[in-house]
């Protein structure tokens, strides 16, 4: 049976577009262990939790961002399936916008750094092709949906 994890692709919008005309920045966290990979906040489902509850709990634990500080974007949910540590893994992501552009990030010990990044930079740091594709799909979804 595959390991199951859930998370949120957290983003914020600039009020004024940057020089490259982008307004969306994604939050990526750098793991403290292993290859120090960059991903959105995510974690394993605990017994009795549903997937979205897991995503919100993991976000709170890993970033300090509470559910009340986020808006979950309707209509976007992605399931990634891959092998991690020789075991099949399923990760489900939703898009979530921070309500406060300057929200404080408080990292857990699981992560050593965070960055807010435009799509191109986020895809460069996200080493896994499935994560890059999910970020691109999320960006495209946001750009085709009124803010």
UniProtKB/Swiss-Prot annotation:
Transmembrane segments annotated in the record for this chain = none
E.C. number, please?
Answer: 3.6.1.17
Establish whether keyword Cytoplasm is in the entry.
no
Positions of post-translational N-acetylalanine modification: 2
Q: Which GO terms describe its cellular component?
A: mitochondrion
Needed co-factor(s): a divalent metal cation
Q: Function, please? A: Catalyzes the asymmetric hydrolysis of diadenosine 5',5'''-P1,P4-tetraphosphate (Ap4A) to yield AMP and ATP. Exhibits decapping activity towards FAD-capped RNAs and dpCoA-capped RNAs in vitro.
What's the name of the protein?
Answer: Bis(5'-nucleosyl)-tetraphosphatase [asymmetrical]
């Amino acid at each position: 049976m595959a390991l199951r994890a859930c998370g949120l692709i957290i983003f914020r919008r600039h009020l004024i577009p940057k020089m490259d005309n982008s307004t969306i920045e994604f939050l990526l966290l750098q793991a403290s262990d292993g290859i120090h990979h960059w991903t959105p906040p995510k974690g394993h489902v605990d017994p009795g939790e549903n997937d979205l509850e897991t995503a919100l709990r993991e976000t709170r634990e890993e970033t300090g961002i509470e559910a009340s500080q986020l808006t979950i974007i309707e209509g976007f949910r992605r399931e990634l399936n891959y092998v991690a540590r020789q075991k099949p893994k399923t990760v489900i992501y939703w898009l979530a916008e921070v309500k406060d552009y300057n929200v404080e990030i408080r990292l857990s010990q699981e992560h050593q750094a965070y960055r807010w990044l435009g799509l191109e930079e986020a895809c460069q740091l996200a080493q896994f092709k499935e994560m890059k594709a999910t970020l691109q799909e999320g960006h495209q979804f946001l750009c085709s949906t009124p803010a």
